[in-house]
């Protein structure tokens, strides 16, 4: 099943779409500068692009951690991004009352992994009529995503994207099961599946309030996932990851974006140039 977002198609057999940007809005200037680089690179490489950022990181481990600019200021920044670059925008919501105002500005709204089973939030998101990106919870198997999809269908919205972001592997670690991408496609009606490589790289030191990360392995993991014929890649970058206010250890240094995407696009083009081979 393909989904139309602005002037491009998101589907598992179509050229991949990049959901890229920054983890959390830090300021208007930094947002526009980062987005400008994404736009320049993706247009040069011919990659369909959706800008991603959070206005509020509502699930930080510490109450003292930076959360973002908030809903009102965040929507103003998203409006400026759309006006300046003419691109679609995706952001996440955490409470039902946020859904409608966000949907009026953003083209795709995202259901956070930790909240994916919250029925009131699911229904509120569905009622907006917007495309919804569902993050697969770390504690849920790929096949159980079907239950969340059915909630959205019952609430009247079938414009859904499924997003892998790693599964809990013991304490303080995540792994990505490459077989899970196919399972989600098969059990959820071949909805578009994308891969959040950034958050799949997270680790955590025992007792730490901040997430660690393995960005040195970002390309390896991204290539492995994209080899399974995916609709898109979810990627966060930062001009200086050491200064990022959230998830810097997992963020791709912004100056490496073009070289990174050249390799991703080459693999995606190769995979999708071949007919699908079904093995029963």
UniProtKB/Swiss-Prot annotation:
Gene3D superfamilies with a match to the protein in the record: Aldolase class I
Organism listed in the record: Neisseria meningitidis serogroup C (strain 053442)
Q: Which NCBIfam families match?
A: KDO8P_synth, PRK05198.1, PRK12457.1
Q: What is its EC number?
A: 2.5.1.55
Q: Which PANTHER family does the entry link to?
A: PHOSPHO-2-DEHYDRO-3-DEOXYHEPTONATE ALDOLASE
Q: What is the lineage of its organism?
A: Bacteria, Pseudomonadati, Pseudomonadota, Betaproteobacteria, Neisseriales
Q: What is this protein called?
A: 2-dehydro-3-deoxyphosphooctonate aldolase
Tell me where on the tree of life, at the top rank, the source sits. Answer: Bacteria
Q: Where in the cell is it found?
A: Cytoplasm
What is a GO molecular function of this protein? 3-deoxy-8-phosphooctulonate synthase activity
Gene Ontology biological process terms in this record = keto-3-deoxy-D-manno-octulosonic acid biosynthetic process
Q: In which pathway does it act?
A: Carbohydrate biosynthesis; 3-deoxy-D-manno-octulosonate biosynthesis; 3-deoxy-D-manno-octulosonate from D-ribulose 5-phosphate: step 2/3; Bacterial outer membrane biogenesis; lipopolysaccharide biosynthesis
């Amino acid at each position: 099943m393909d989904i139309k977002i602005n002037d491009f198609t998101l589907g598992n057999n179509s050229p991949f779409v990049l959901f890229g940007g920054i983890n959390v809005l830090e300021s208007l200037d930094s947002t526009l500068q980062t987005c400008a680089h994404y736009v320049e690179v993706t247009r040069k490489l011919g990659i369909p692009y959706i800008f991603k950022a959070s206005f509020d990181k509502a699930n930080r481990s510490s109450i003292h951690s930076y959360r973002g600019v908030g809903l009102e200021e965040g929507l103003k920044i998203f409006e400026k991004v759309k006006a300046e670059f003419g691109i679609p925008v995706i952001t996440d919501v955490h409470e039902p009352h946020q859904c409608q105002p966000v949907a009026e500005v953003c083209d795709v709204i995202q259901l956070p992994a930790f909240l994916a089973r919250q029925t009131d939030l699911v229904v509120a998101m569905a009622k907006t009529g917007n495309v919804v990106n569902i993050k697969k919870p770390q504690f849920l198997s790929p096949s159980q995503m079907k239950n969340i999809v059915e909630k959205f269908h019952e609430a009247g919205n079938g414009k859904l994207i499924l997003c892998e972001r790693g599964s809990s592997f013991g304490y303080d670690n995540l792994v990505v099961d490459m077989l899970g991408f196919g399972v989600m496609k098969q059990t959820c009606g071949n909805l578009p599946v994308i891969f959040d490589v950034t958050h799949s790289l997270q680790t955590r030191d025992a007792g730490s309030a901040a997430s660690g990360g393995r960005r040195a392995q970002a390309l390896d993991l991204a290539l492995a996932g994209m080899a399974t014929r995916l609709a898109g890649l979810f990627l966060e970058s930062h001009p200086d990851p050491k200064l990022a206010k959230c998830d810097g250890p997992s963020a791709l240094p912004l100056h490496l974006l073009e070289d990174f995407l050249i390799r991703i696009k080459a693999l995606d083009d190769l995979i999708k140039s071949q007919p699908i081979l079904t093995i029963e």
